[in-house]
Amino acid sequence: MSASLQQSMLEAIETELKRQVARLDQTKVISFHEMLTYHMGWTGEGAGTQATGKRIRPLMALLSFASFHSPNHDAKTDWQNAVSAAAAIELIHNFSLVHDDIQDNSELRRGRKTVWTKWGAPMAINVGDALFVIANQSVLDVSNHYPAEVVVKASSILSQACLELTKGQFLDMSYEERTNLTIE
């Protein structure tokens, strides 16, 4: 894959993430939307490429998709049909970061104040929850390009991954307090 294809994918991912987060860009909840855009690295002090992160997870998803395309399709353009699913992966990652920052009492993320240190833990939990829901809506958006059974499978895989993520976070937190750890 060429560097220009990767750059096109990253640009498409960023555009899609902004489109998905814009679901909350409404007058009554504009400050809530601002919290999400702050966490995503788009607004506020220190906003920019360092604050957004590398977007490696959605990029890997699109590169994988392009690598395993059908011979009847063009890998150079087919990946565009999967951008909303790739964005869902990044949104899930960010949901987990917001919650993890609270759970670990982390005050900084990517060189900036975390959401909970700026707006408090209750608001940060709500921001994380919103990112989780938006991610689930984002994966469903592939229904514009794929049959229902593919969409259901993609949604199921994302849900299972989230369940595994929360189990891992539970273990992480519970191990912090344990003194009798074994290899098993």
Where are these predicted regions, by residue range?
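Conserved N-terminal diphosphate/IPP-binding helix and adjacent helical/loop segment
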Residues: 1-92, 98, 102-117, 172-173, ...
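All-alpha helical catalytic cores of prenyl diphosphate-utilizing isoprenoid enzymes
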Residues: 22-32, 48-57, 125-126, 133, ...
